[in-house]
């Protein structure tokens, strides 16, 4: 079930979306095309949640998301960029389902407690592939088969581990320790389920309204800024460093939003409001332990 579905077919131009992500390959439902489209999107469209801290209510209909990401060259969160990718894949001929996931908070080492993430399941030639271009921290760029076998990519291992009633997306770096990304059910959801997520996060009392979060692939590394913490995932090693002042924030944002200068300006505006004195409004950040046990 497509969160961007409506009573009529999408009218936005597929050519423009594919130009936005720089994809020039064949438009046919093959694994090779799926991999190339996912790679092109992940490397071209930044992840960002700038709407919530600015009090902007995003529209999730197809035309609005397309306008934000393509003509206006914006980024987006899972409800936007994963939904846009799902719609594009369907128009090319892929069978795509959208399911709800519960994200793992890497800085706090716990799940959010909410089904607050959209994940795509692409059914192709008898295999189900997990696709996700809308997650802040490191996830696989390429589709991962839903078969529990480890999948190697850019110095990391990924797998989809089944439990009693959930599937846990996990990754392992050079230390060999499997850590969760999110968990989900193979249970396609209607559009209304995703509208509920949006409404929750836009309430002023939620942490998203006071959180600056953006991410991008850069020179083979995944850079994720979460308020005043920069999480860098590079060839199997993840590190967390503080971003202590506006100059450092500007440098990080310039790298994450390269070729998207308007997003740098907007993100710095959010930074100044959240950190007028370079103070962390949500308290100290727990260290990420290299000996963290695998979540059960």
PLM region spans:
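Secondary-structure boundary elements
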Residues: 5-73
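Residues at alpha-helix termini
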Residues: 20, 91, 255-256
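Residues within well-ordered alpha helices
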Residues: 17, 88, 252-253
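Linear, non-domain "peripheral" regions
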Residues: 1-12, 263, 291, 295-296
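Cysteine-centered nucleophilic/redox motifs
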Residues: 73-100, 120, 214
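Extended, charged low-complexity segments
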Residues: 229-296
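His-Asp-centered catalytic microenvironments across diverse enzyme cores
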Residues: 2-21, 25, 40-46, 103-248
């Amino acid at each position: 079930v497509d969160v961007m579905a409506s009573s009529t077919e999408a009218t936005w131009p597929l050519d423009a979306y594919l130009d936005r992500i720089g994809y020039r390959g064949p438009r046919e439902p093959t694994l090779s095309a799926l991999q190339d489209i996912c790679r092109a999107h992940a490397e071209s469209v930044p992840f960002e949640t700038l709407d919530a801290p600015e009090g902007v209510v995003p529209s999730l209909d197809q035309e609005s998301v397309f306008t934000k990401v393509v003509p206006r060259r914006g980024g987006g969160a899972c409800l936007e960029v994963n939904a846009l990718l799902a719609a594009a894949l369907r128009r090319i001929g892929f069978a795509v389902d959208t399911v709800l996931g519960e994200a793992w908070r890497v800085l706090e080492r716990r799940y959010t407690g909410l089904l607050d993430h959209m994940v795509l399941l692409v059914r192709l030639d008898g295999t189900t592939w997990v696709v996700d271009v809308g997650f802040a921290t490191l996830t696989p760029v390429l589709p991962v088969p839903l078969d529990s076998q480890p999948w190697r990519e850019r110095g990391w291992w990924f797998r989809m581990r089944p439990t009693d009633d959930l599937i846990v997306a996990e990754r392992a770096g050079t230390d060999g320790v499997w850590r969760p990304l999110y968990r989900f059910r193979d249970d396609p959801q209607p559009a209304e389920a995703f509208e509920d997520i949006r409404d929750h996060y836009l309430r002023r009392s939620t942490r998203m309204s006071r959180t600056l979060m953006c991410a991008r692939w850069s020179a083979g590394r995944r850079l994720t800024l979460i308020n005043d913490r920069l999480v860098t995932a590079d060839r199997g090693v993840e590190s967390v460093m503080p971003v202590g002042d506006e100059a450092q924030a500007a440098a990080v944002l310039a790298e994450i939003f390269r070729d998207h200068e308007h997003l740098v300006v907007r993100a710095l505006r959010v930074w100044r409001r959240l950190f007028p004195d370079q103070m962390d409004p949500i308290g100290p950040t727990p260290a990420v332990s290299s000996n963290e046990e695998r979540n059960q």
